[in-house]
Amino acid sequence: MNGQVTKARMNIQLWRPAALDEAYSLLEKLAPDVCAASGSTLLQLQWDKGTLPKQHLVSLEGIDEMRGISTSDTHVSIGGLTSLNECRKNPLIKRALSCFSDAASAVAAPGIRSRATIGGNIASKIGDFIPLLLVLGAELIVYQKELIRLPLGAWLSEEDFRTAIVTRVIIPRAEGERVFYHKLGRRQAFTGAAAVAAGRFLKDGSIRLAAGHADITPRRLLDSEAKWMAPGWDPHELYKTLIHELPFSSDVFMSAAYRKKAAANVIMAELMAEGGE
């Protein structure tokens, strides 16, 4: 961490609102030199990379309505302040949505999971959970002067909600359906994933696929889904579609081509296991 970042961190003004309306008012009032935080693990990573901190930090940790886990016959509701470790261990989640608790074991190192929150993972728009949540059809409850419920995919793509606070995620239960999740590379490092891929085989015979990595916003792989659902699909053609569609970029550690190949290989293995030609 360079000296400029260290000095800026020492001058951060911390705000601790107790309610959503208070937190949102602070974010509006102090913009653009402000950010919201809960576990702050992403901020730590950004600072370590040399990104200068904002002058104001609004902690969401005192907002009780962002806590709590509940289940119904159809959905699991998880408060935004729930830690990734709690997502991994909570008995309600393990019983109702085991694929989600299993995925939590693959996200980051244990020390990070104890601090990082599901709300922060989603709010970053580059979180490792997002591909899985996309294929599960998750919805968010966000606060932007009022509580708004909307699909995760819409929130990721619409600029209208860029200042909204992610208060809760609502996840449909996927009972009787096979779901897969793979995080590739650098699991135990304090860095993001090299690639993340997720899929869900629905009871109606359709499929959902999504992928992403630490530097880009994950998205559904709609062309690849359509290829797989076409009668007599060809594995070679589907592989080429995956390589073309995977939304990956290069960084100093890894090329986009390597990421694409690694993710396409694990996705193809799952598709072939489900019923390849």
Curated annotation (Swiss-Prot):
Q: Name one GO biological process term.
A: hypoxanthine catabolic process
- Pathway(s) of this molecule: Purine metabolism; hypoxanthine degradation; urate from hypoxanthine: step 1/2; Purine metabolism; hypoxanthine degradation; urate from hypoxanthine: step 2/2
Q: Does the keyword NAD apply?
A: yes
Q: What does the UniProt keyword field contain?
A: FAD, Flavoprotein, NAD, Oxidoreductase, Purine metabolism
Q: What class of enzyme is it?
A: oxidoreductase
**Which Pfam families does UniProt cross-reference here?**
FAD_binding_5
Per the UniProt entry, the Enzyme Commission number(s) are: 1.17.1.4
Gene3D superfamilies assigned: 3.30.465.10, CO dehydrogenase flavoprotein, C-terminal domain
The annotated subunit structure for this chain is: Could be composed of four subunits: PucA, PucC, PucD and PucE.
Write the protein's name.
Answer: Probable xanthine dehydrogenase subunit C
Species per Swiss-Prot/TrEMBL record? Bacillus subtilis (strain 168)
